[in-house]
C-alpha cells in the first residue's frame, strides 16, 4: 500500500548540503517505490518560494514545497523559526495528510524539530552529525520530542552513539546513500583528487610533497566547503596542481569519474568517500592519518606505483558503493515506514451491538480510604457517585485491591456499575491501572511484567496520566514498545497541574488510534466526576471495550488548589486521629 511521506530538512534547498542530497536521493527512490513524497524545506531562491506559496494555496501535492526563506541555523541558538514559516509548516502538514513525517537533524532549532513535535503522523528522525544535537537544551523537551518519534535513524555509528546520549532509544544505522547513476567510473587517468578544507591541510601538504616523486601524475584539490584563503601550492608543482570547487554533486561527478586515486579528508564528508567509491576510484585512506599525515603520502605512492592494486581497489570500491545506493537506502527506509504501520489502530466509530443501551457517565479513576493518601470511605464514595449522576466508576486504589473488592460487594443492589481495579506502581516507569481485576497485583515490577500480570487476570490495561512529568511516567521507548498492550489511554485526568499533559495524551491517543479514557483521579468526594466518559452502558470487560468506541470525553474541572487543599486537610485530620 503506497504511503504519503513528508521529508523535512532544516537546510536551505537552494544551497548545496549533504543532508539535502540525501533527502533528494531517497525522495526520488521512494517515489519509484510508489509512494507520494513531499519535501518541506526553507529556500533562498525566489522561484522556490513563489512555487511553495502557490502549492500551499492550491493544496497541491508538490515534490518540494519551500515553506519560507532560509535563515541561519546556530547550534547554540534558541528556536528562531519565524511565525510565517511556522504557519506554512502547519498548513503543509494539515493539507498533506501524511502517513509518515521524517525529520532530518531535529537536534537543531529548526522546522525539522517543529514538524516532529507537532505532527500526529508516524514520526522518524535521522541524525547525521554529532555536532548538530544541541537542541532542545531542556531534558523535558527532549523527552517530549522522543515521545512523538517512532523510529530513530543515524547515518553512522558515531552519530548514533552521540545522538543516543541526548535522545535515548534504539537506533537503526543506514548509509547516507549515493547516486550510482550520476557517479560512475569514467576513463581513468593519472589524477589524484584530494578533499580540501580547513581540517585537511596537513594531509594535503603531505600529499603534495609526495607528488614530487610521482612524475606524470596531477592533483586536484577539491573544495567541498567554502574556504577563506587559497591553499599554498609549491612553485614547481603549479602546472600539475589545480583547485576545483566540489560543492555541487554534478561537479564532483565529473572530477571523480576520471580520478584514479582519491584522498578523503580525515574529518571530511562521508558522502565524498561513497561518491569516490561509486566512481571507481581507489581510496588512499589509511587509519591514523589524522595524527600522522605522512601515512596518506605513503598510501598515495603505493597506489600510484601499483596499477594492479589500484584496479582491485577500484572494483571493491564500486561494489561497496552499489550496496549503499539511494535505491538500497530507500528500500531500508520503506521497510522502517511499513513496520511502523502496525502501531496505529483503525478508528472504529460504529454503533455496534450496544446502540440500544442507555448512555451513562463513567469515571474511570478514583480512590478510597484503602489508598494511603485518601480518606474516602467506600459507602460514602458510592452514595456520592450516584448523587453526582454517575452510572459507572472504577475503584483504582494505589497498590491495593481491597477497596475495589469492598466496593463491588457494597454496590450489589445499586444501579451503579463498579469496575474493580488497582493503580499499580512499577519499578521506575510510572503507574499502570488494571481494570476488571480479580486479585491484587504487587507493586515494584517492571512495566511489561505489570501488564502481563493484568493480562493473567483477563483485565483491561488502562494507562493513567502518561505524560504527567511532575511524577514518574513511562519512558518514550517503553510506550512505543508496549503500544499493542495498551487497551485504554487516559487522555483527561482532572488532577493534573498542567493541562498540556492531557493535551499531549490526547494527541498520542489520536495518533495511534488508542481508545480514550478519562477520570477524576479523585482523592476527596468533591473531586468525583470531574473527569468522565459519556458511554453506553456495559457489562464486563468485552462490552466495556466495545462501548469505548463511541465514548465521549467530558471535562468538568474544579479548582485544583481547592481539591488539593481538601486532600491535605483530610490527611492532616487522619494523622491527628
Segments predicted by a language model, with ranges:
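Conserved donor-binding/catalytic core segment of Leloir-type glycosyltransferases
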Residues: 6, 186-212, 220
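Charged catalytic cores and adjacent phosphate/nucleic-acid-binding surfaces used
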Residues: 342-368, 372-383, 402-409, 413-441, ...
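Nucleotide-activated donor-binding/catalytic signature segment of Leloir-type glycosyltransferases, i.e.
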Residues: 229-248
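N-terminal strand-loop element at the rim of the active site
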Residues: 3, 9-14, 28-80, 224-228
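Carbohydrate-associated surface elements
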Residues: 43, 158, 177
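A short, well-ordered alpha-helix in the C-terminal region of glycosyltransferases
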Residues: 302, 309-323
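C-terminal alpha-helical cap of glycosyltransferases
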Residues: 302, 326-347
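Membrane-proximal helix-turn-helix segments that form the acceptor-binding/catalytic region
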Residues: 130-152, 159
Amino acid at each position: 500500500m503506497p504511503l504519503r511521506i513528508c521529508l523535512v530538512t532544516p537546510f536551505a534547498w537552494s544551497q548545496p548540503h549533504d543532508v539535502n542530497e540525501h533527502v533528494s536521493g531517497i525522495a526520488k527512490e521512494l517515489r519509484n517505490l510508489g509512494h507520494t513524497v513531499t519535501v518541506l524545506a526553507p529556500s533562498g531562491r525566489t522561484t522556490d518560494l513563489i512555487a511553495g506559496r502557490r502549492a500551499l494555496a492550491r493544496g497541491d501535492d508538490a515534490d518540494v514545497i519551500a515553506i519560507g526563506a532560509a535563515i541561519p541555523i546556530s547550534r547554540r541558538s534558541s528556536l528562531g523559526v519565524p511565525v510565517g514559516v511556522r504557519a506554512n509548516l502547519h498548513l503543509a502538514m494539515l493539507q498533506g495528510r501524511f502517513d509518515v513525517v521524517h525529520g532530518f537533524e531535529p537536534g537543531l532549532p529548526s522546522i525539522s524539530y517543529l514538524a516532529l513535535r507537532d505532527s500526529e503522523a508516524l514520526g522518524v528522525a535521522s541524525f547525521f552529525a554529532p555536532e548538530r544535537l544541541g537542541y532542545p537544551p531542556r531534558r523535558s523537551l527532549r523527552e517530549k520530542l522522543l515521545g512523538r518519534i517512532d523510529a530513530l535513524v543515524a547515518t553512522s555509528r558515531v552519530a548514533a552513539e552521540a545522538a543516543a546520549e541526548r535522545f535515548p532509544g534504539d537506533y537503526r544505522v543506514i548509509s547516507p546513500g549515493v547516486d550510482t547513476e550520476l557517479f560512475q567510473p569514467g576513463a581513468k587517468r593519472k589524477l589524484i583528487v584530494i578533499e580540501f578544507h580547513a581540517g585537511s591541510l596537513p594531509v594535503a601538504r603531505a600529499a603534495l610533497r609526495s607528488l614530487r616523486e610521482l612524475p606524470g601524475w596531477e592533483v586536484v584539490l577539491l573544495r567541498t566547503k567554502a574556504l577563506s584563503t587559497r591553499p599554498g601550492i609549491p612553485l614547481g608543482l603549479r602546472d600539475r596542481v589545480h583547485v576545483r570547487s566540489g560543492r555541487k554533486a554534478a561537479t564532483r561527478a565529473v572530477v571523480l569519474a576520471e580520478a584514479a586515486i582519491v584522498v578523503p579528508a580525515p574529518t571530511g564528508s562521508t558522502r565524498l568517500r561513497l561518491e569516490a567509491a561509486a566512481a571507481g576510484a581507489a581510496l588512499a585512506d589509511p587509519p591514523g592519518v589524522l595524527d600522522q599525515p605522512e601515512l596518506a603520502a605513503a598510501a598515495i605512492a603505493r597506489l600510484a606505483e601499483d596499477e594492479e592494486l589500484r584496479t582491485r581497489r577500484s572494483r571493491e570500491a564500486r561494489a561497496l558503493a552499489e550496496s549503499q545506493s539511494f535505491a538500497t537506502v530507500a528500500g531500508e527506509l520503506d521497510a522502517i515506514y511499513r513496520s511502523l504501520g502496525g502501531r496505529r489502530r483503525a478508528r472504529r466509530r460504529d454503533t455496534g451491538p450496544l446502540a440500544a443501551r442507555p448512555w451513562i457517565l463513567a469515571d474511570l479513576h478514583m480512590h478510597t480510604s484503602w489508598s494511603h493518601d485518601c480518606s474516602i470511605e467506600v459507602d460514602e464514595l458510592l452514595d456520592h457517585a450516584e448523587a453526582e449522576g454517575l452510572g459507572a466508576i472504577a475503584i483504582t486504589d494505589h497498590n491495593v485491591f481491597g477497596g475495589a473488592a469492598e466496593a463491588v460487594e457494597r454496590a450489589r443492589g445499586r444501579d451503579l456499575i463498579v469496575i474493580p481495579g488497582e493503580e499499580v506502581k512499577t519499578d521506575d516507569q510510572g503507574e499502570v491501572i488494571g481494570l476488571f481485576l480479580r486479585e491484587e497485583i504487587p507493586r515494584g515490577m517492571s512495566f511489561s511484567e505489570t501488564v502481563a500480570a493484568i493480562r493473567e487476570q483477563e483485565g483491561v490495561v488502562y494507562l493513567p496520566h502518561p505524560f504527567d512529568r511532575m511524577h514518574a511516567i513511562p519512558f518514550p521507548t517503553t510506550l512505543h514498545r508496549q503500544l499493542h498492550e495498551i487497551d485504554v489511554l487516559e487522555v483527561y485526568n482532572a488532577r493534573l497541574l498542567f493541562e498540556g499533559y492531557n493535551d499531549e495524551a490526547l494527541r498520542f491517543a489520536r495518533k495511534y488510534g488508542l481508545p480514550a479514557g478519562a477520570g477524576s483521579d479523585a482523592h476527596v468526594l468533591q473531586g468525583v466526576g470531574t473527569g468522565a466518559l459519556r458511554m453506553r452502558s456495559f457489562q464486563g470487560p468485552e462490552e466495556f471495550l466495545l462501548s469505548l468506541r463511541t465514548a465521549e470525553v467530558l471535562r468538568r474541572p474544579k479548582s485544583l488548589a481547592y481539591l488539593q487543599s481538601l486532600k491535605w486537610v483530610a490527611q492532616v485530620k487522619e494523622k491527628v486521629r
